[in-house]
Amino acid sequence: MQRRRKRRITTTLALIFGTFLFVTLFLSFILFPIHVKSDTMEDGLSAGGIAFVCPLLKKPERGDLYYLSRMDGHRESYLMMCADSFIRFFTFQQISPFSESSKSSGQPFVRRVIALPGDSIYMKDFVLYIKPAADKHYLSEFELSSKPYNVQIFSIPAEWDNVGVSGDLEEQTLKEGEYFVLADNRVESLDSRHWGAIKSERFLGRVLLQYFPFTSIKAY
């Protein structure tokens, strides 16, 4: 009887450890959920929504939504990232003990990839115009993207002209490994207009699916 009890306890502990290991590895390398807390990506991603990110996909195309590393340069240890993913998964994104921050630059964020390495770009009235390296003419971001999306652009008072991020940018050319990312809310969000081009190593994974709220399920 005692031997059977020990065997049952050992089996249970092995099952718990195996489940923990599987979930941790899955959330670290295959698919992990993120909680979208702001409206910077509406209508693409809903504020308060939860989406899946695939860390295996790190070769962006125009129009892709990508999860980017925090802009303050801080990186959590691998163990802390695994533990954070595990806790977030089982608390439905309500608790994230190792990634919470009060600073906008102190946590990972989602932005849309608009321009690729080698592109020449300029912005007019919050819309980016792009000339790929092999082309001779500029086209709008919407004409070049294979993925349809909408952006929030609304008129602002004249006294706001010098406040926040500009809706106009002079021509520039992206270098190798540089990407230009923008928020869908072009008036009230920080993005490459403020930070400059994003290096490829900042991509943590591509956003694949918003699965919550259930009334707004979207694939990207």
Predicted regions and their residues:
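Aromatic-capped interface at the extracytoplasmic side
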Residues: 24-41
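Classical N-terminal secretory signal peptides
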Residues: 2-4, 21-22
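Hydrophobic membrane-insertion alpha-helices, especially the h-region
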Residues: 11-29
